[in-house]
């Protein structure tokens, strides 16, 4: 009679081929169906408690991405609307770029803060203090790249208790799939989705 340990060993040995042939998500990739597109919603914001974040509109990032350059007319209009309504506007740069490198169409005006960081614009900057000092409760996050500065800064804002408005015509990446997955992630991720609203610039009301 075989001992219980031998029976267990035999059972485990039988499982090895099954485990080795189990498919990973990468193996299943071609068969995964994309989720339905998220809904873009109209948004009304209070200019007194809302800030517009213009992230990394500089040549090395925006200039290298045709989709970012294509977003500039909408971003220029949104920026002017924010300024007209007295909204707080903050800009960011990355790498070795400086405030004066920000593209002319969306360049900061005197008094508009510019922070320099990597993909999370709250990290090692005074952005959080700037927003808190002005009583900001909602941020409109725009810029490039969608999967870099936008995703990480928007997430950081949500985790700090702010509401996040994400106009999809104001975020850009090197390809459309990247923009798509960022939009999906922001309205499905735990702790972030409840604070995030997807919209487009023409649905924003001040």
What are these regions (language model features)?
Residues 65-82:
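…and closely analogous acidic/polar surface helices at protein-protein or active-site interfaces
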